[in-house]
Swiss-Prot record:
The lineage of its organism: Eukaryota, Fungi, Dikarya, Ascomycota, Taphrinomycotina. Its main location: membrane. The modification Phosphothreonine is found at T442, T448. Sodium export from cell, takes up external protons in exchange for internal sodium ions. It comes from Schizosaccharomyces pombe (strain 972 / ATCC 24843) (Fission yeast). Residues 696-713 have a biased composition (Polar residues). It is a multi-pass membrane protein. It holds the Pfam family Na_H_Exchanger. GO terms for biological process: intracellular potassium ion homeostasis; proton export across plasma membrane; regulation of membrane potential; sodium ion export across plasma membrane; sodium ion transmembrane transport. This is Probable Na(+)/H(+) antiporter C3A11.09. The chain crosses the membrane at residues 12-32, 36-56, 105-125, 133-153, 172-192, 206-226, 244-264, 295-315, 319-339, 361-381, 415-435.
Length: 759
């Protein structure tokens, strides 16, 4: 008999194991999460397996009594807190502004995954009926918000996920845990109720209308009332800071308790209450710096997954007398993890506005983990099939093979547990394998030769996936000053003695990339040391070593993500501000596609739109032109207009868009060109103000140009570049004229060169 002072009890041993593991995990949590990219669920499950009843035999929850009931209630507490936090962390009015994405992800995608999982279970487990396969498949339809925390939380990898995709996965994982109840009860009612028409009636009236619809309304009412009450208390000074921070946790417990008491879906009540509670993002902004929700979630997740690792039914994974073997479960897990969500998300990608391209669709389809929600739904299903209640009976009650649906009750728990274990391994380590493969593939040896490498020390370290700010023109001054100050710190100061001056002048060495060519200022001038004084290095604030803080300093507002060929700009809440595709930006225009014979651009709609654009451009050019001028004899201006109209649209806009003239300028230009032919007595070699004459090969003025007959000599004009008029103004008598007088008497003429138009 051992000494009474060191007697070990089961609860105290459980406290020591869970507390010891949690302490060790927190001491090295940064390395595990940020370096190894492993979540807390994976490490906690492995700890439970080691200390559980099949290895160390120190932590044995199966000896505590009714294990199913304990597991169900622990899972209920964790889920109501997690789904409430998921709803509270969403941006302002997210469910209303993104209802289309949520509708597609919660109904078509879930139904597709439910039916696909049913087919695999019905094919691989031979003794299961189709309705029983529907019931088991409904347990794994929902995604888990706990396992999805690695991509929807605040970790290092989650910051690389675009905000719109992260918010969509967060809202889906919080809402579909409660949405799995209708799928489950449809299969259960079809199994236990005869005839089938009663099953449909009860399913619509009890499950859809009362439990789900009324549960959502009740949760929204609770959230709105709680939001108004906490605002009132905070304004009147009735709450302290500690109570304010923990208010969301106790409100989640209240939603779970009141939902269970009145018989509605408590998970939907909690999620809707969280979304309504933080509908205006007021509470999220108030608690943004405290991180109290993350602390509570971490404690609950670590404790529960240690418990999950200890209750895994390892002997039941291989039961030959039940036609259940390990290879069937392995094949089933592979098929379900691949085909449950990925094909559905790729299929409905065009109907989800928050999914931009196939890369995001593949990412969203892969991260649909199976976790705590599957265990909770499985225990509810077993209780309904056993005793037609949500409270499970002790395990001894299901040992009788004479009860209905005995085989389904026996194989349901090991099948769901194996799928949960597979999801923990795959989704918990997929980020680690992704980052490892990415790092291996990007190893390269590069060599760059520069004249001076001092400027490289001032460049920020850019990591793949990190958003980069686009600096405005005003920020160029500070950039130049920072480069100059860094060069001053690394080079010695040269002191040159001035013989005429009493003091010495200090000259600083120039930057290597600014030594030959002077740096241009934003206004077109040069940077001057007196105009832009360098800032003192000692007065600068020291850089923070935390990478996240440095990234926040670089990107205080909008964030930019390059996803494949798509450039997405988001605000701080994950809303898409702009979406640009490189294919659209760099691709050929409509006119180029029509010229190249693109079959997609030859459709009637594209041709008609191109025709309307050309017609509108022609109408705008001829809008102010008088009718009498259109009937005149073709002159140089009309020939230029005809050439301009026959040019492609994209070349007109890019080359001569700044030379458009109005009707007054056109009349002045034609009047001056007409006077050229009338002044035969004047010297033709004297250039007139504002007029650029054309010259032929013999350097003589062309008579065809004076008469306005250029249509026969267009090909000859293309081979000659027109010479420019001299800069100095010359009068008709050959004497120079002052610049001011020349500017006053010079006509406002914009002469379009034919050779430039044809180029």
């Amino acid at each position: 008999m051992a000494w009474s002072q060191v007697e070990i009890s089961k609860p105290h041993l459980a406290y020591a194991i869970i507390g010891g593991f949690t302490s060790l995990f927190m001491l090295c949590s940064l390395i595990i999460k940020e370096k190894l990219f492993l979540g807390e669920a994976t490490m906690a499950t492995a700890t439970g397996l080691i200390f559980g009843p099949y290895v160390a035999k120190l932590f044995v929850p199966t000896s505590w009594g009714n294990t199913d009931y304990i597991t169900e209630e622990l899972a209920r507490v964790l889920l109501v807190v997690e789904v409430f936090a998921a709803g509270a962390e969403l941006p302002r009015a997210y469910m209303l502004r993104h209802w289309r994405s949520m509708f597609v992800m919660l109904l078509p995608v879930m139904i597709f995954g439910w039916l696909v999982s049913t087919g695999f279970m019905y094919a691989l487990i031979p003794r299961l009926s189709f309705l029983e396969s529907l019931a088991i498949a409904a347990c794994i339809t929902a995604t888990d918000p706990v396992l999805a925390s690695s991509i929807v939380g605040k970790g290092k990898f989650a910051r690389r996920v675009p905000g719109h995709l992260r918010n969509m996965l967060l809202a889906e994982s919080g809402c579909n845990d409660g949405m799995a109840i209708p799928f489950l009860y449809l299969a259960i009612y079809l199994i236990i109720e005869k005839p089938a028409r009663h099953a449909g009636r009860d399913w619509v009236c009890i499950i859809i209308l009362y439990e789900c619809t009324f549960g959502c309304v009740l949760g929204a009412i609770i959230g709105v009332i709680a939001r108004k009450m906490i605002k009132f208390s905070e304004r009147r000074g009735l709450m302290d800071r500690e109570s304010f921070l923990v208010f969301y946790f106790v409100l989640a417990l209240f939603c779970g308790g009141i939902g269970t008491i009145i018989g509605v879906d408590d998970l939907l009540v909690s999620f809707c209450a969280g979304a309504a509670f933080s509908w205006d993002s007021w509470f999220s902004k108030k608690t943004e710096e405290s991180h109290v929700s993350n602390v509570i979630d971490l404690l609950l997740n670590l404790s529960f997954f240690v418990y999950v690792g200890a209750i895994m039914p390892w002997p039941q994974f291989h039961m030959p007398h039940m036609d259940l073997s390990v290879w069937r479960l392995v094949v089933l897990a592979i098929c379900i993890l691949i085909a449950r969500r990925i094909p559905a998300v790729l299929l409905f990608k065009s109907f989800v506005p928050d999914i931009i391209n196939w890369r995001e669709a593949l990412f969203a389809g892969h991260f649909g983990p199976i976790g705590v929600g599957a265990l909770y739904t499985c225990l509810v299903a077993r209780a309904e099939l056993e005793v037609h209640s949500t409270v499970p009976e002790p395990n001894d009650a299901i040992e009788n093979p004479e009860i209905p649906n005995w085989y389904c009750i026996q194989v349901m728990w090991p099948v769901v547990c194996f799928l949960v274990l597979s999801s923990i391994i795959v989704h918990g380590s997929s980020i680690a394998f992704f980052m490892l493969g990415k790092r291996i593939n990007t190893l390269a040896l590069s060599f760059t030769r520069t004249r001076d490498s001092h400027f490289a020390f001032n460049l920020p370290r850019v990591r793949q996936g990190q958003s980069l700010p686009i600096k405005r023109v005003d920020a160029l001054r500070s950039s130049a000053n920072s480069i100059a100050s860094s060069i001053r710190r690394r080079h010695p100061v040269n002191i040159q003695e001035d013989e005429d001056a009493d003091i010495s002048t200090v000259s600083l060495p120039e930057a290597a990339h600014l030594r030959e060519e002077r740096a241009e200022s934003p206004r077109g001038g040069h940077y001057d040391a007196e105009e832009f004084p360098s800032e003192d290095y000692e007065s600068r604030q020291p850089r923070r070593s935390n990478e996240e803080d440095r990234e926040e300093e670089m990107n205080p507002g909008d964030e930019t993500y390059l996803i494949g060929e798509d450039l997405v700009v988001e605000d701080s809440q994950g809303n898409i501000i702009s979406h640009t595709s490189s294919r659209d930006a760099n691709g050929p225009s409509i006119d180029e596609k029509l010229a190249q014979g693109d079959p997609k651009a030859k459709s009637f709609g594209r041709k008609f739109r191109s025709f309307l654009r050309r017609s509108y451009d022609t109408f705008q050019r001829n809008l102010h032109e008088p009718d009498d001028e259109r009937q005149r004899e073709p002159t140089l201006g009309h020939i230029e207009s005809s050439i301009e109209n026959h040019r492609p649209r994209y070349s007109r806009q890019n080359s001569e868009s700044h030379l458009r003239e109005n009707s007054v300028e056109r009349r002045r230009r034609e009047q001056v060109l007409t006077n050229i032919g009338d002044s035969e007595s004047e010297d033709d070699n004297i250039p007139r103000p504002g007029i650029v004459p054309f010259y032929n090969e013999n350097n003589e003025s062309s008579s065809d140009t004076r008469n306005g007959l250029l249509s026969d000599n267009v090909s000859e004009s293309r081979s000659r570049r027109p010479s420019r008029a001299p800069s100095a103004a010359v009068s008709s008598e050959g004497s120079p004229v002052e610049e001011d007088n020349e500017a006053q008497h010079r006509p406002n003429i914009r002469f379009l060169e034919l050779t430039r138009a044809w180029e």
